[in-house]
């Protein structure tokens, strides 16, 4: 949680550095945001007594359902700046969790991040979502093997990095004035052959929040 808050604060600072304004964050209006609430909420629902510790299949299925909902949200909003990175990160985390029945956490990463108490807890009884990384785990490069030192104190995965970078991109782009593009009502793209000798106007590049202000294509002022 501390790392997430730090990423958000850093993103806001970067937004100001690039000429953004905080009030423009209201332009972030994702579709189907209820999938995020449902997907995250599933992870906090207590499983029946004994299931979390003994029934690996049910535990894995619950986590897979949670991440599936979050990935669906990312795909439905993939045109938003940075959302494709968030979706990639979620897919990476889901893959390693499903393959290993939970997210493996490196003991060394926990030590380097100052989480000896978490290490002792996982060694003693484990957790619903995490377990200590072992030689039997697969795709360990996607596990929680990256240590973020104190004062953050957290072990993260490659997927987490993708999510945080995508979130930063989204916040900075929104603060700089990004807004969802909308086609005028009743307008349709022209089809068919162009008249001979006619020149086609260059199509605008997709705006991911980093085009110069007022520009529709790179290298143009209007």
What kind of feature is each model-predicted range?
Residues 111-155:
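Extracytosolic (periplasmic/ER-lumenal) interhelical loops and adjacent juxtamembrane/interface segments
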Residues 1-66:
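Transmembrane alpha-helical insertion/packing segments
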Residues 58-65, 155-165:
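Membrane-interface loop-to-helix entry segments
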Residues 186-222:
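Long, low-complexity, intrinsically disordered cytosolic termini of multi-pass membrane proteins
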Residues 52-56, 81-86, 103-113:
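A cytosolic-side transmembrane-helix exit/cap motif
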Residues 10, 38-45, 65-68, 85-95, ...:
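Lipid-exposed faces of alpha-helical membrane segments in multi-pass integral membrane proteins
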Residues 69-99, 104:
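Interfacial segments of alpha-helical transmembrane regions
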Residues 12-22, 73-81, 171-178:
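Structural signal for the C-terminal ends of transmembrane alpha-helices
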């Amino acid at each position: 949680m501390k790392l997430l808050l730090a990423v958000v604060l850093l993103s806001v600072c970067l937004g100001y550095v690039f000429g953004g304004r905080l009030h423009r964050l209201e332009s972030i209006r994702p579709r189907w945001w209820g999938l995020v609430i449902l997907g995250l909420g599933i992870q906090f629902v207590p499983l029946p007594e004994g299931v979390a510790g003994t029934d690996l299949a049910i535990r894995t299925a619950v986590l897979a359902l949670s991440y599936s909902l979050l990935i669906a949200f990312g795909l439905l909003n993939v045109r938003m700046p940075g959302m494709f990175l968030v979706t990639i990160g979620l897919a990476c985390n889901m893959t390693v969790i499903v393959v290993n029945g939970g997210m493996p956490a490196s003991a060394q990463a926990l030590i380097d991040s100052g989480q000896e108490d978490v290490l002792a807890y996982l060694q003693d009884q484990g957790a619903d979502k995490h377990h200590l990384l072992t030689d039997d785990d697969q795709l360990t490069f996607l596990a929680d093997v990256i240590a973020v030192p104190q004062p953050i104190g957290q072990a993260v995965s490659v997927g987490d990095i993708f999510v945080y970078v995508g979130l930063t991109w989204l916040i900075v782009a929104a603060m700089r004035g990004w807004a969802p593009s909308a086609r005028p009502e009743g307008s349709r793209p022209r089809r068919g052959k162009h008249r001979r000798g006619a020149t086609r106007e260059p199509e605008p590049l997709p705006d991911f929040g980093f085009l110069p202000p007022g520009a529709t294509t790179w290298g143009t002022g209007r």
